[in-house]
């Protein structure tokens, strides 16, 4: 049986063997608290590649040490971190998948002993520290850090990079009027609030020629915040700058109640795709092959990002293939165990 989920997908100069993406998920497992890769990361990502994921995306990786969520985050702020990341891409490639990395800065959500930085001195909630409002020099240094991180990503062998512009982290904080109260050229109008991301994309384009994704929070879930329609305009600007795909998540900009249900964020991928004609990724409580296949067949998204389901079962692609009646070729090492995987779901 033919399956769109298991059909190849080419984006720019990279061809994925299927449409399944391992969504970036922080593991907080840099054992030396120096941003370095550990054996856990090699096993964690290599296993999902062996499980037949098309694109394995490494978790949010900090472009500056002070931009980590925690001191156990992965980092890419120094050349000495390239070696471990290169081992990771080698594990991924050797097991048949393409490798991506999410470049990130936590902004006001950095939970370190040092200062947190943000576009404006507004804490996420009353339990978190008041961040330092970034001055122009700090903004420029952070933009340069993203560029250097992109170059290190190339040296480490990644095929795709994703800029983390979602979930209330630094880029998202500049985009949203809830967190950006600046009165200079980086605040105020949508064009000014987009300027930080615009300059990051421009700087990354100078050193990176592969596909670039951007993860967005397409809904602030706040009456004064951004909606998916605001992100239509942001996406049009990103598309003009050469961004290849928008990874459509939502929320976490400010504390808010979110009604979650299977596929609750697919609507955002569909809306962005329809109104901008850019490729999109759907993410959020997508847990079955039939659900993923329907999203693709309905032209609501181009790639399917799977998170927690891949934590529960690194061989999710095999289960999805069984469900869809698609014959997935297992790694040759596992050919002595043909047939269906049985689950208790």
UniProtKB/Swiss-Prot annotation:
Keywords: Detoxification, Flavoprotein, FMN, NADP, Oxidoreductase. Coiled coil: none annotated. The keyword S-adenosyl-L-methionine does not apply. FMN binds at residues 23-26, 60, 102, 215, 307-308. Its EC number is 1.6.99.1. Substrate binds at residues 28, 164-167. The keyword NADP applies. Homotetramer. This is NADPH dehydrogenase. It comes from Bacillus cereus (strain B4264). The lineage of its organism: Bacteria, Bacillati, Bacillota, Bacilli, Bacillales. The gene is namA.
């Amino acid at each position: 049986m033919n399956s769109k989920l298991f059909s190849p997908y080419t984006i720019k100069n990279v061809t994925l063997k299927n449409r399944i993406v391992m969504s970036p998920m922080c593991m907080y497992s840099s054992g030396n608290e120096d941003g370095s890769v550990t054996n856990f990361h090699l096993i964690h990502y290599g296993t999902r590649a062996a499980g037949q994921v098309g694109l394995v995306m490494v978790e949010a990786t900090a472009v500056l040490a002070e931009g980590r969520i925690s001191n156990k985050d992965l980092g890419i702020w120094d050349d000495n971190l390239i070696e471990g990341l290169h081992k990771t891409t080698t594990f991924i490639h050797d097991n048949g998948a393409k490798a991506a990395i999410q470049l990130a800065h936590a902004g006001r959500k950095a939970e370190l002993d040092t200062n947190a930085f943000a576009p404006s001195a507004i804490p996420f909630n009353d339990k978190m520290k008041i961040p330092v409002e970034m001055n122009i020099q700090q903004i420029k240094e952070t933009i340069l850090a993203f560029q250097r991180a992109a170059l290190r990503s190339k040296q480490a062998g990644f095929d795709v990079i994703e800029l983390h512009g979602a979930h209330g982290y630094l880029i998202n904080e500049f985009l949203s009027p809830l967190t950006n109260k600046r009165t200079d050229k980086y605040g105020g109008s949508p064009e000014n609030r987009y300027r930080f991301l615009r300059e990051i994309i421009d700087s990354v384009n100078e050193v990176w020629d592969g596909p670039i994704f951007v993860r967005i929070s397409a809904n602030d879930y706040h009456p004064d915040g951004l909606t998916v329609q605001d992100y239509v305009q942001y996406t049009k600007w990103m598309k003009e700058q050469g961004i290849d795909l928008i990874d459509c998540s939502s929320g976490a900009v400010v504390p808010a109640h979110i009604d979650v249900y299977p596929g609750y964020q697919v609507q955002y991928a569909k809306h962005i795709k329809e109104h901008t004609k850019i490729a999109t990724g759907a993410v959020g409580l997508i847990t079955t092959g039939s659900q993923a296949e329907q999203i693709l067949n309905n032209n609501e998204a181009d790639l399917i990002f799977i998170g927690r389901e891949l934590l529960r079962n690194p061989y999710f692609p095999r289960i999805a293939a069984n469900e869809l009646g698609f014959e997935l070729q297992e790694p040759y090492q596992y050919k002595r165990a043909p047939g269906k995987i049985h689950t208790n779901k």
